[in-house]
């Protein structure tokens, strides 16, 4: 194994460990009295049970000892994508899935995220487009999680794909929705939208020339 491969494996292990630590904190809330804490935790437990069951049913060589390796970031991402894209997913499960997605995404390899970005973006566009469509406390948390997903998706768009952000209607529409939340009456939602805009427009890779900089200035004028 060469140096590059060693670094790649090390980074993957670090991301897995970081995600496991984050999910462990959520898992402990499965018996919480607060619905917006309990629901994502219970969904996480259900997802992990499904992933473990799938791992145990995979065919193996006759003499190979069964060793079930914990699911990694990509497996969690695929499970959440499946829930978010299903037509029969309830509003509550959708909301919990978006929250878990905001936790998982930063730990998934950028190439995998880019391959799934269009579907994931569509999944979070709905709550952003209807920011008052649910119970107040649950909706606040759902919006902040959706903004976290958008930030993660924007963060991994390479500079060479500038035209994707400039031309794709879904991206433009989502950015406009984010800008609208910058003047939302709810302080936590407004603050999270401000953070997203500030972080994305100031990313060093774009050298202060992000595709949405002018659009944001025109909106603020």
Name each model-derived stretch.
Residues 1-221:
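Extended, low-complexity, acidic/polar intrinsically disordered regions
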């Amino acid at each position: 194994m060469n140096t590059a491969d060693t670094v790649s494996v090390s980074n993957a292990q670090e991301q897995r460990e970081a995600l496991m630590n984050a999910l462990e904190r959520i898992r402990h809330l499965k018996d919480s009295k607060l619905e917006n804490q309990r629901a994502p935790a219970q969904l996480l437990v259900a997802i992990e049970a499904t992933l473990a069951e799938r791992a145990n049913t995979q065919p193996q060589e006759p003499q190979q000892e069964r060793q079930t390796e914990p699911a990694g970031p990509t497996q969690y991402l695929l499970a959440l994508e499946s829930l978010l894209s299903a037509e029969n997913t309830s509003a509550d499960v959708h909301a919990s899935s978006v929250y878990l997605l905001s936790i998982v995404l930063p730990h998934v390899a950028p190439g995998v995220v880019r391959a799934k970005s269009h579907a994931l973006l569509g999944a979070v566009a709905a709550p952003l487009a209807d920011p008052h469509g649910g119970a107040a406390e649950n909706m606040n948390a759902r919006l902040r999680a959706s903004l976290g997903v958008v930030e993660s998706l924007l963060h991994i768009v390479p500079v060479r794909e500038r035209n994707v952000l400039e031309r794709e209607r879904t991206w433009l529409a989502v950015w406009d929705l984010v800008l609208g939340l910058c003047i939302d009456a709810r302080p936590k939602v407004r603050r999270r939208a401000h953070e997203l805009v500030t972080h994305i427009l100031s990313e060093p890779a774009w050298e202060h020339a992000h595709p949405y900089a002018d659009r944001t200035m025109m909106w603020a004028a």
